[in-house]
């Protein structure tokens, strides 16, 4: 974190010519269990991770917004709050910021201009929600600078709106909500229908490992939309608002009315919701054996019923599983078709898992993995800088 603060301060000071007054952070996230349940009004169990976006900021006394993207060679954007905020097709990173500010304005929050510089170490394209962290960081920055009466939940919803309607990417609410509302040493059980959140204490004996398969994610959008349609079709046949409301018994009773794919997609969602609720309970009890079982079932369900895993990801899961047995859990995390696996393991197994993956993964797939060892972290907020800038 200190390196990020130093970096962002250096860019801010050298380009704007004065020192920032505030620092804000917003974390990335990993979803421990509850995959493709969010748009079915179901449950998810993510935690915020100690990889984050950091913003250095200061108020202006006019209506100008000036932005520096430190990680894009200090690229800059500038726009006025007095004119309609436009989408920039040739500067994608800037649209996340423009979108957040546009919707804050639309919600009638009152604020003026600001100078901001942004940096981060949330890996991009790994499915760890760097875009949601950016949206939440900007919302949090405006809230902090201008003491806006906006809740963390509203910051999350505003970020989601920016991504869906301004940037033009479909996403559920989980990523923004965990970035805005995460708690240190806790996962967050989120009800994606009511947006109610319950903090679930992580066992001290559990370390979060994220292993990126580095398999480029192809077909994500088209396959995501197909899965979504299949889930909606199943809900219609079952005569429920969303698959969150269906039981396995209801699904079995209507099996003859749906094709096999639609049936299996629905079976994944219904069982995954149940697993997610059980996993929250197991986590609370510190029952890693039960968690191991639930995460294994989740992966099999994603592989066989939802069909969103790929060989490289399945290979990683098998390698990790062979090391940890029932002393932790492992499964694919994220939208699918590549991306990362998440493992919850005891501290003594981190080195063994790392060794096994480094020795076997490339040999079996031709790809080199990237490993992140994380801990469940605090959601977005103001950073008190007590030790000065180094």
UniProtKB/Swiss-Prot annotation:
- The UniProt annotation places ATP binding at 125-131
| Enzyme Commission number(s) of this protein | 2.7.1.6
Q: In which pathway does it act?
A: Carbohydrate metabolism; galactose metabolism
What PROSITE patterns does its record include?
Answer: GALACTOKINASE, GHMP_KINASES_ATP
Please list which residues make up the signal peptide: none
Which parts of the sequence bind Mg(2+)?
Answer: 131, 163
Point out the annotated site residues (description: Transition state stabilizer).
Answer: 29
* Annotated Gene3D superfamilies: 3.30.230.10, GHMP kinase, C-terminal domain (3.30.70.890)
Instruction: Enumerate the catalysed reactions.
Output: alpha-D-galactose + ATP = alpha-D-galactose 1-phosphate + ADP + H(+)
Please tell me one Gene Ontology term that the record gives under cellular component: cytosol
Q: Which GO terms describe its biological process?
A: galactose metabolic process
**Where is this protein localized, as stated in its record?**
Cytoplasm
Q: Quote the function comment for this protein.
A: Catalyzes the transfer of the gamma-phosphate of ATP to D-galactose to form alpha-D-galactose-1-phosphate (Gal-1-P).
- This protein is called Galactokinase
């Amino acid at each position: 974190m200190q390196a990020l603060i130093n970096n962002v301060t250096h860019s801010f000071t050298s380009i704007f010519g004065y020192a920032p007054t505030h620092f804000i952070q917003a974390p990335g996230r990993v979803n421990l269990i509850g995959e493709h349940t969010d748009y079915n009004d179901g449950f998810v169990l993510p935690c915020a991770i100690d990889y984050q976006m950091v913003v250095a900021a200061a108020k202006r006394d006019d209506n100008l917004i000036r932005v520096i993207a430190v990680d894009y060679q200090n690229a800059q954007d500038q726009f006025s709050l007095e004119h309609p905020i436009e989408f920039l097709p040739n500067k994608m990173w800037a649209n996340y910021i423009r979108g957040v500010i546009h919707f804050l304005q639309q919600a009638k929050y009152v604020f003026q201009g600001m100078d901001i510089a942004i940096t981060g170490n949330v890996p991009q394209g790994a499915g760890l929600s760097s875009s949601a962290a950016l949206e939440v960081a900007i919302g949090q920055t405006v809230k902090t600078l201008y003491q806006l009466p906006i809740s963390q939940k509203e910051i999350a919803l505003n970020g989601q709106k920016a991504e869906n309607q301004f940037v033009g990417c479909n996403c559920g609410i989980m990523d923004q909500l965990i970035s805005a509302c995460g708690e240190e040493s806790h996962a967050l059980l989120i009800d994606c229908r009511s947006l109610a959140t319950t903090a679930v204490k992580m066992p001290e004996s559990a370390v979060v490992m994220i292993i990126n398969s580095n398999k480029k994610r192809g077909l994500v959008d088209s396959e995501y939309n197909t899965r979504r349609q299949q889930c909606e079709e199943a809900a219609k046949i079952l005569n429920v608002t969303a698959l969150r409301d269906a039981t396995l018994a209801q699904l079995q009773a209507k099996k003859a009315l749906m094709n096999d794919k639609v049936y299996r997609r629905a079976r994944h969602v219904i069982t995954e919701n149940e697993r997610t609720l059980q996993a929250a309970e197991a986590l609370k009890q510190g029952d890693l054996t039960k968690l191991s079982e639930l995460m294994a079932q989740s992966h099999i369900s994603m592989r066989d019923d939802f069909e969103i895993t790929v060989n490289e990801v399945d290979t990683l899961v098998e390698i990790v599983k062979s090391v940890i047995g029932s002393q932790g859990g492992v499964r694919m995390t994220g939208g699918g078709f590549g991306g990362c696996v998440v493992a919850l393991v005891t501290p003594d197994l981190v080195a063994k898992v790392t060794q096994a993956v480094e020795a076997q993964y490339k040999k079996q797939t031709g790809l080199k993995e990237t490993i992140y060892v994380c801990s469940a972290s605090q959601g977005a907020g103001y950073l008190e800088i007590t030790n000065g800038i180094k």
